[in-house]
């Protein structure tokens, strides 16, 4: 897509990155200027690679690029492989929910409408964007995954059947924009 943008003389390439690029940083909140050279998953490495490619295209071809690091997006029409949908489905079906790091995970959940608003603003403000830019797109309000599950339980009026497991390789313990 970025190469097509260059060939079709698109003036501003906006792309989705991810909070996963931060890995398991201890210092929070995450800042766009933090070092992201040590991804802990292949997904994070692919997002970091996209950022590097965008930076290089921006430099070589004078193409404005803006990367948006999304933090745990949720809402209607979301991906069915993401925690909110998995948790709801499994609670409703009486199935076990696997909760990693023994329940000590935190996520900076971001509602999809907020993501759409930011994307629209970045596109509309293209003339005022610098050559290469990265933005964190989150709420700056990490929520414990167990609190999130308890909220779902309250809404559904049904208790979750939880299986606590250790952290998996590549899992990020906390995200915080």
List each language-model region with its residue ranges.
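Catalytic helix-loop patch of NAD(P)-dependent Rossmann-fold dehydrogenases
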Residues: 3, 7, 11-12, 21-67, ...
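Conserved active-site helix of classical SDR/Rossmann-fold NAD(P)-dependent CH-OH oxidoreductases
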Residues: 48-55, 85-88, 116-117
């Amino acid at each position: 897509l970025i190469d097509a943008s260059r060939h079709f003389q698109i003036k501003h390439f906006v792309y989705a990155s991810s909070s996963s690029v931060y890995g398991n940083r201890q210092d929070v909140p995450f800042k766009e200027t933090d070092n992201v050279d040590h991804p802990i998953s292949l997904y994070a490495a692919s997002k970091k690679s996209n950022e590097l490619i965008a930076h290089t295209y921006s430099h070589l071809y004078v193409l404005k690029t803006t990367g948006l690091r999304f933090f745990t997006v949720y809402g209607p029409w979301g991906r069915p492989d993401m925690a909110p949908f998995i948790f709801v489905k499994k609670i409703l079906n009486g199935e076990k929910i696997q909760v990693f790091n023994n329940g000590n995970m935190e996520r900076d959940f971001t509602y999809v409408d907020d993501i759409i608003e930011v994307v629209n603003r970045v596109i509309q403000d293209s003339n005022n964007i610098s050559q290469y830019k990265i933005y964190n797109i989150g709420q700056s309000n990490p929520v414990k995954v167990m609190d999130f599950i308890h909220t779902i339980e309250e809404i559904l009026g049904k208790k979750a059947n939880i299986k606590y497991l250790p952290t998996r390789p590549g899992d990020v313990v906390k995200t915080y924009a």
